[in-house]
Amino acid sequence: MARYRGPVVKIMRREGVDLFLKSSYTFNKDKFHRKGPPGMPTKRKGKVSEYGTQLREKQKLKRAYGLLEKQFRNYYEEASHSHGVTGEILLQLLERRLDNVVYRLGFAVTRRQARNFIAHRHVLVNGERVDIPSYRLNVGDKVEIREKFRASTFIADNIRLSQSLQGIPSWLSADYTNFGGDVTALPERHHIDLPVKEQVIVELYSK
């Protein structure tokens, strides 16, 4: 499946916010906080149109979860045909992806790294190997790191970093002794720390 594999700090500068695409080990905040988006500097900054604002919010969310347009559109279509608030359901569907849960549990420092672990079959769901990053988890599902990969320095370092920095969302429970975690509830809007206005994205797609 196609993926963006280019520089991620440039993406975050374009969106103007930290999308948690870069590990804290290697994140150069000086680069991120350079004034303005990447590219040649411009003398004037024109007023952003309503469409421009909607587009930027969509791009932020797509890029945070590492999705291309077709994938993202499919999530939106599913959310729009579900009962409830479309924007919140969209976020919930994205949060329930396996790559995101591996990241949220602290076994990976970025969603991109989590996708790599999953693609190499280092992750188990309910005792079975799963190599699909978009695999959707349900309440009661158990995620584990494969036994042969548990000794990796990546995992030990990531767990230490996670415990000291981000913490685990309350809809998940982590068991670091056994290199696993459980989905204990469905994520709600207040659990999701991304600086995105999901209703603006709904307005863009509903035109």
From Swiss-Prot:
PROSITE patterns, alphabetically?
A: RIBOSOMAL_S4, S4
- Give the molecular function GO annotations: rRNA binding; structural constituent of ribosome
User: May I have one GO cellular component term?
Assistant: small ribosomal subunit
- Carries keyword Zinc? no
Where is the signal peptide, in residue numbers? none
One Pfam family hit: Ribosomal_S4
Ordered alphabetically, the record's keywords are: Ribonucleoprotein, Ribosomal protein, RNA-binding, rRNA-binding
- Identify the residues that the record assigns to the S4 RNA-binding domain, covering every copy: 96-159
Query: Known InterPro entries for this protein?
Result: Ribosomal_uS4 (IPR022801), Ribosomal_uS4_bac-type (IPR005709), Ribosomal_uS4_CS (IPR018079), Ribosomal_uS4_N (IPR001912), S4_RNA-bd (IPR002942), S4_RNA-bd_sf (IPR036986)
Q: Which GO terms describe its biological process?
A: ribosomal small subunit biogenesis; translation
Which family would the database say this protein is a member of? Belongs to the universal ribosomal protein uS4 family.
Oligomeric form and interacting partners: Part of the 30S ribosomal subunit. Contacts protein S5. The interaction surface between S4 and S5 is involved in control of translational fidelity.
Function description? One of the primary rRNA binding proteins, it binds directly to 16S rRNA where it nucleates assembly of the body of the 30S subunit.
Q: Which PANTHER family match?
A: 30S 40S RIBOSOMAL PROTEIN, SMALL RIBOSOMAL SUBUNIT PROTEIN US4M
Q: What is this protein called?
A: Small ribosomal subunit protein uS4
> Could you tell me which species this protein originates from?
Leptospira borgpetersenii serovar Hardjo-bovis (strain JB197)
Protein encoded by which gene: rpsD
